[in-house]
Amino acid sequence: MLDSIKQKKNSKRIKMRIKTGDLVKVINGKEKGKTGEVLKTIPLENRVVVKGINLRTKHVKPTQEGESGRILTEEASLHASNVMFFSKDKNIVSKIEFFIDKEGVKKRKLKKTGELID
């Protein structure tokens, strides 16, 4: 247990092009073709949590007397390589590239169309 925690702390942070709040489309796996908003990114594991996708049920035991158990449904993480940025305006998926504009600000744009994201 302790070794796995140390390993995660010592592992390199992976640079992710997808950010929290982006609209993504699942391109691989059992949820293929579905779209959703990114709720959370986990850079150390290169994973993302997408709203309404990859749902898992969790059975929770009662913690106090008189309380009944519950069944919770929550989103599990997906590997970042299984999702792509989805443009709602153009209705396409595309890779993301970074560039620096004339003012020296780092921005993101779609590789297919050149549409600015940030």
From Swiss-Prot:
Alphabetical list of PROSITE patterns matching this protein: RIBOSOMAL_L24
The record, for SMART domains, names: KOW
Give the GO terms filed under biological process for this record: translation
> Which residue pairs form cystines in this protein?
none
Q: Which InterPro entries match?
A: KOW, Rib_uL2_dom2, Ribosomal_uL24, Ribosomal_uL24_CS, Ribosomal_uL24_KOW, Translation_prot_SH3-like_sf
Entry keywords, A to Z: Ribonucleoprotein, Ribosomal protein, RNA-binding, rRNA-binding
GO molecular-function terms, A-Z: rRNA binding; structural constituent of ribosome
Q: Where are the transmembrane segments?
A: none
> Which Gene3D superfamilies does UniProt cross-reference here?
2.30.30.30
Q: Which GO terms describe its cellular component?
A: ribonucleoprotein complex; ribosome
Assigned protein family: Belongs to the universal ribosomal protein uL24 family.
Describe its function.
Answer: One of two assembly initiator proteins, it binds directly to the 5'-end of the 23S rRNA, where it nucleates assembly of the 50S subunit. One of the proteins that surrounds the polypeptide exit tunnel on the outside of the subunit.
Q: How does it assemble?
A: Part of the 50S ribosomal subunit.
Query: Which named protein is this?
Result: Large ribosomal subunit protein uL24
